[in-house]
């Protein structure tokens, strides 16, 4: 999936390249793909660990951080209820091994793993995965957008 950086719209001209993040406080969730990308692709930025995206949005809006690294799907949900923010034109480069979602299954649960793999193979073959993803994003926007808004 695409990984992006959220910034304030008022800072749009300040962040157009990786170099623009030198010395900048950029938030990302601890032990996340975004934190890994942040530290590897923006080595001169100051990585700031955030507990969750709602806190990260608040920190971005109040100036505690200047940017927030998130998955693009999350960014789109955040933007729905925070019109003062935008996606930075510069995006992370994501290696192929990080582009897929994962499912965690307890080690040794071979029967469950086989059922899950069969269901996923059928979903991909039938072209359902893309529509499921779009439906999930729409549902998440409707139920979770308010959680990351400071409009309350």
Give the location of each predicted region.
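Periplasmic-binding protein-like
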Residues: 1-9, 80-120, 139-152
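Flexible hinge/capping segments at coil-to-helix
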Residues: 7-26
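Alpha-helix capping/helix-boundary segments
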Residues: 33-34, 55-56, 74-75
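A ligand-binding cleft/hinge motif common to bilobed small-molecule-binding domains
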Residues: 37-40, 61, 66-97, 136
């Amino acid at each position: 999936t695409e990984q992006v950086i959220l910034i304030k719209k008022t800072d749009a001209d300040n962040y157009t390249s990786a170099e623009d993040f030198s010395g900048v406080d950029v938030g990302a969730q601890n032990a996340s793909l975004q934190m890994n990308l942040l530290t590897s692709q923006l080595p001169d930025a100051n990585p700031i660990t955030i507990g969750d995206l709602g806190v990260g949005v608040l920190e971005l809006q109040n100036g505690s951080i200047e940017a927030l690294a998130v998955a693009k799907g999350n960014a789109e949900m955040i933007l729905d209820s925070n019109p003062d923010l935008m996606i930075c034109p510069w995006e992370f480069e994501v290696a192929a091994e990080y582009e897929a979602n994962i499912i965690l299954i307890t080690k040794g649960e071979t029967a469950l793993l086989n059922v899950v793999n069969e269901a996923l193979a059928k979903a991909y073959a039938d072209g359902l995965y893309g529509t499921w993803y779009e439906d999930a994003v729409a549902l998440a926007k409707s139920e979770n957008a308010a959680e990351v808004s400071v409009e309350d």
